[in-house]
């Protein structure tokens, strides 16, 4: 659990990578990295392999989380950004519910098969990344973004809400689930159900 959060603290290094890689390409690369890390977790022979795949997966996830809002804002004009960002959030929430619901229904009728779930989830993620690379053209940035780290005092509320959202995710998605399984022996389907309710 601790290793998984190291890339989260290093997510700001995405700014340095963007000096050499276009932001759109970096986002797609992050998505593919997330998929690869997830897929190869299924083949873990040792605990060290699990640590390695967790870090790979986490780098992909945290870089993607860092980039997706920024990329959306560059793609959209200032007039259409609020509406489209809201639609993207709605779509993301729906997909989250659909995936968790599908996993829960699967667990109700079939025995848990970690190998299949990890390979399938990772494979789908990689396929989406390749599709994005091939199908979505490189777009010109409508808003030129500064490639430097800066803080603005007037954005303090946004920073606070982002921090609290991250803390909430850590508590409910990461550590609470781990604690319920490790200390209280919760079944996998019950953890999925709790995550589904939390996502709703």
Specify the residue positions occupied by each region the protein language model found.
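Intracellular juxtamembrane helix-capping segments at the cytosolic ends
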Residues: 63-76
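Juxtamembrane intracellular "pre-TM" segments in multi-pass secondary transporters
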Residues: 134-167, 183
